[in-house]
Amino acid sequence: MNIGFKEDLTIEFKSDKNKLPDSDLVDAVVAFANTNGGDIYLGIEDDGEITGLHKSHQDITQLAAFIANKTVPPIAVRAEKSEDKQYLKISVPKSRSIVASSSGKIQRRRIKADGTPENVPMYPHEIASRLSDLSLLDYSSLCVPDAKYSDLDPVERERLRSIIRMNPQGEQN
């Protein structure tokens, strides 16, 4: 039996025939939370074939609690079994901060050249960009080491002064 749709940036299938390792599930949740959120279908192969849940993943309350305990900050997922109880849909919200696994692993999702999704590490240089996307970091407010007054464009300084003067709510100094 096939689920009838494919994986994309917000949908991931995870096989659970031989019990998906807990770390793989947590990494997938972290990647979704650090991208746009989405749904993880546990008990479904990459080709969409429904192969069923392992007995250790039958308790959805326990699974949701486990995920919250293994993510930093804790991610509250919503887990629901299919009507035939053969697979689990785990809905992961988009996080308003950067999320890591409790072991310190930070992941994100992306689309490969062939159009299929994958989870990849989020490297330190990508963290500032992600924080900016979340409106948590303003690059213009960062200090520039060794900058001097003479580095600033005098025309732009005068343009800024003019804008400030025209704003009746702004300071006049």
Question: What kind of feature is each model-predicted range?
Answer:
Residues 1-173:
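Conserved N-terminal catalytic/coupling substructures associated with nucleotide/phosphate chemistry
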